[in-house]
C-alpha cells in the first residue's frame, strides 16, 4: 500500500463461481489514523457489508455430539467472495442464527432449519437440503456408493481428495445429489469423518 494511505473499504467481487476482483478504497491518512475499514462482499451483484472486526469478534458454534449433527437439515457452502474475504467465523453470526460450523478448519455450515426463500444464504453461497448422514468408513462408503450411483463429490478436511473419495464411492458424476466427505469437530473430542448426502436448493 502507498505510504500515508489508509484503507477505508475492501471490495471482494465474485461472479459465475469465481472471485473476479479485489478492490481497495484508499484515502490519505496520518500516523494515528484509525485502521477500521468496511469489508464489502459482492457475490453476483448481491452485496453484504462487514466491519473490519467482524471475523475477529465472531465466535462460531460447533457440535457437542453426533446427535446434534444428525439433527441438521441444511448445509451451507460459502461462495467465492465470502471465502476470499476470509469471513469463516462471521458467517455464523451474519447469515443466520443457529448456524453450526463443521470444524475449525472445515468451512461448511449446518442448520436444523432450512432458510426461507429470501435468506441471504442463497445469494452468498450454495444451500443444500440434507438427505443422509453417516460416519465415514469402508462400509458406509460402499453403501453410499450403491445408494447414490450418480453424484457430485467433495472432500473437506479429510485424509483423501475429492477424486480419491469419488473413486472409493464408485459413483458417476451427475444427478442431483452431492456427497460431502467432511471432517467434523465434536466439542473437545478428536475430529471424525462423516459422509453427508445433500440436494442443492435452487436459487429463487
Q: Each PLM stretch: what is its role?
A:
Residues 1-204:
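SAM-dependent transferase fold signal centered on methyltransferase-like domains
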Amino acid at each position: 500500500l502507498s505510504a500515508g494511505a489508509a484503507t477505508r473499504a475492501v471490495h471482494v467481487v465474485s461472479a459465475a463461481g469465481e472471485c473476479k476482483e479485489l478492490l481497495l478504497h484508499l484515502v490519505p491518512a496520518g500516523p494515528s489514523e484509525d485502521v477500521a475499514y468496511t469489508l464489502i462482499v459482492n457475490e453476483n451483484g448481491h452485496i453484504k457489508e462487514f466491519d473490519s472486526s467482524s471475523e475477529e469478534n465472531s465466535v462460531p458454534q460447533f457440535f457437542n455430539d453426533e446427535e446434534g449433527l444428525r439433527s441438521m437439515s441444511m448445509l451451507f457452502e460459502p461462495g467465492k467472495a465470502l471465502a476470499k474475504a476470509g469471513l469463516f467465523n462471521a458467517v455464523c453470526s451474519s447469515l443466520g442464527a443457529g448456524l453450526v460450523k463443521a470444524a475449525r478448519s472445515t468451512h461448511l455450515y449446518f442448520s436444523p432449519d432450512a432458510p426461507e426463500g429470501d435468506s441471504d444464504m442463497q445469494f452468498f453461497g450454495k444451500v443444500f437440503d440434507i438427505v443422509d448422514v453417516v460416519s465415514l468408513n469402508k462400509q458406509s462408503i460402499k453403501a453410499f456408493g450403491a445408494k447414490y450411483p450418480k453424484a457430485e463429490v467433495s472432500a473437506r478436511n479429510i485424509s483423501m481428495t475429492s477424486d480419491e473419495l469419488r473413486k472409493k464411492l464408485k459413483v458417476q458424476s451427475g444427478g442431483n445429489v452431492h456427497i460431502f466427505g467432511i471432517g467434523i469437530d465434536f466439542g473437545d473430542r478428536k475430529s471424525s469423518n462423516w459422509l453427508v448426502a445433500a440436494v442443492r436448493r435452487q436459487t429463487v
